[in-house]
Amino acid sequence: MRTFIFNFIKMKKLKLVSLAIAMACATPSFAGGLLTNTNQHVAFNRMMSREASIGIDGVYYNPAGVVFMGEGHHLAINWQLAYQTRSIENDYALFTNNVNNPITPRTFKGEAFAPVIPSFQYAYNKGRWSLQASFALTGGGGKCTFDNGLGSFEKIVAETAMAACGLAKTVDNVLGNTLGQPGMQMFTTDQAFGQKGEYSYNSYMHGRQYYYGLSVGAAYKFSDNFSAFAGVRGVYASTNYYGYVENIKVGNMPLYKVLDPNKENAANIELSCDQSGIGFTPIIGVDFKTGKWNFSAKYEFKTRIRLKNKAVNQAPSISALPDNLSRQMVGTLTQVFTNKGMTPENAQAVAANTTQAVLTNGDVV
């Protein structure tokens, strides 16, 4: 995070307030991410150009200018509320194969709600010195939830469905040629994968980001017109991302029955990721006032945060696919050969040999 602010305003008579408690609807500054939130005092919601003002909110916006306030203690306590929606459009062509929502482009809607976004600014002025501290959510500030997941999630499901249908068609073609029955269907029937790549699934995603910032510093008044500030902000990052894709069905076939019929979650995808870290931001500032004019500048150095990652992920059990596919083919073919008059033992042996020939065919593997 790095910000550089330079501004000036024509000074007017300021009313000093020792304690301010306010509530306001936050601007989209609390959208999240690694950028610095600038609405760290509710006065920002009333007027965004605060960087050259002299007031208690200057502990963040103009820390060098706070020393020009009256002597004694100054405190501001802020409570903000944020609500916003995020809409992501995706026009991936295969979304039309979704049997529950066969349209494209598709809009994936997320909702973010943060009922309490607290912050405070404190200053103690004595003589030429001003000791200051503040706390705020310098980044992030809430949780965004996508009840139907994201387009990138559905894209994986749509492509998986097409790949499954393609594999099913190839297996059926090779199987039919091997048995001398072109057009034979085992996996491409409407009761199985089908041939259109149709799919259904359930999905969910939420992300939470909080970057807590605690700043301390001091300003010194060199003259009645000029002051300077130096301080540091410590930032503690805490984030979480959680999402899943489950109950994937290709055609009328639950995908887990092919991957591992003994585990209903064999085809599920799940992500749970926690991140945390600490960083520090050096801050310097100057303020110069003359007559009815006030000039100020503040520079925040880049904050370097090394995030520690803890993830618990679940991916589909693809490794069991060949064995499960083989068992299904052997079982189905055994029944076919038994119906043609073979003994169960011979039918199973022929079914096993046929399955081996099909699955090792160059068109399948």
Model-identified regions with their sequence ranges:
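Residues that define the transmembrane beta-barrel architecture of outer-membrane proteins
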Residues: 57, 113-118, 210-214, 276-282, ...
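Outer-membrane beta-barrel channels and translocator barrels
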Residues: 70, 126-129, 223-225, 290-293
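Gram-negative bacterial Sec-dependent N-terminal signal peptides
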Residues: 8-31
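N-terminal, post-signal peptide beta-strand-biased segments of exported outer-membrane/organellar beta-barrel
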Residues: 27-146, 152-160, 164-165
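Transmembrane beta-barrel domains of outer membrane proteins
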Residues: 57, 63-67, 119-125, 219-221, ...
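Solvent-exposed loop segments that connect transmembrane elements
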Residues: 93-103, 149-201, 238-273, 307-365
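Transmembrane beta-strands of outer-membrane beta-barrel pores
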Residues: 79-85, 135-141, 234-238, 290-292, ...
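Membrane-embedded beta-strand positions of outer-membrane beta-barrel proteins
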Residues: 75-79, 133, 218, 230, ...
